[in-house]
Amino acid sequence: MFIGREKELATLNGLYNSDKFEFAVIYGRRRVGKTALISHFIQDKKAIYFMGVESNEKQNLENFSQAIMEYASGIMPGTSFVSFQAAIEYVFKLCENERLVLVIDEYPYVAKASKSMASTLQMLIDKNKDNSKMMLILCGSSMSYMEDNVLAYKAPLYGRRTAQMKILPFDFKDSCKYFNRFSAEDMALIYGIVGGTPQYLLQMNDSMSVEDNIKNVFLNPASAIFEEPENLLKQEVREPAVYNAIITAVATGSSRMSEIATKIGETTSVCSQYMKNLINLGLIRKETPYGEKESRKSIYAIADNMFRFWYRFIPDNNSIISRGATELAYKRIAPNLSDYMGRIFEEICMQYMWKLLLDGESPVEFSNLGRWWGTDPQERIQTEIDIMGDQDKSTALFGECKWINENVDVKVLEKLKKRSRLFRYENVHLFLFAKKGFTQGCIEEAGKMGNVSLVTYDQIYEYLNDRGITAF
């Protein structure tokens, strides 16, 4: 079953239908579904699909030759081309009169094994593109390699591509499509636990409770995910121990560079380079208060939900998990799940806000959204706003998100109203998001104010999943 990626498929099909030479670059983290996307795209098309392996040039060339032989007739079985140049020239020959897709998956493995691969492709593209019906797709999981050696200005292939796609994990809406039997609340928890990476979503079983899924997948040493974060780091970086320490520090509450450096016992200059690599891998993101330039107020957060959950709960409980004390480990995790879900709920609420905007239903036509934190000059205390976005210098929205089992009280609305006055906007709209609902007092005050939207999680879930209800 293939889910989502409608825009990416539309782009690929548009390129294919041009019937002229096209060169698409597809890249993204491991497990996000790049190969599944390509396989779905070429399933009804003439195509040569070759996946590079982490081996030498000879092995990769033999595998590439085999892929070509499986498509083309007139080549003796067991034949191997003498070089990648000869092999690719042969494929260009096949594309003189027919539309053919050539896919080189895990391209970084091939290019590292064959140092002349990029310049060979450059030469052959320049020579044949004007008279070729080839659609070339280069795909890779090493994002730094693809960005530096395929997409970058100094790369040999720069200027040859006709499209590029960075494949990201699914958002909450598309993640929901994987399941039919989870309740709305359980679906939020599942998204908070594994995020939108297809390979991780497939580990979840909607015939089981969230508790049993956590026990079966995260608290089970035999599961595919149990060592996934550490294994992925080993594949991507040279010093996984330091990266592990950094991610653990962020997951357990250290958010500023100085705090992280102190926590792991390294200097901030050393930490900053590691952090840059983690950002490039899509595992960490740097956040700055909305509307402000990068400053000392910038903080770091884990960008991937599965990594966030794993590093928040597994390392501290690793010893008892390894000894089979699943129930004890879950007993330690369960009381912290509601607090953990707070930031996940903010993320879901922002996705809701973006859909409102795209559907033309947002009361404020913002250009961006983000969190804000800083000092309240009147009370001289640190404060924060969960969601903020502005349309122009006079119009903005502010949001507060509460993942709690009680109805949200009017005091929360009053606090949000007060925080919004830290900024000099003439027109302000307030959003209160609640897991459960709102007290009567909160509902009445929102009605009096007239510039407030009260939105429950159930409404968000129904709206994001196109169940035909009003936005709020």
Q: Model-flagged regions — what are they?
A:
Residues 290, 299-472:
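A cross-kingdom feature that marks ATP-driven nucleic-acid transaction machinery
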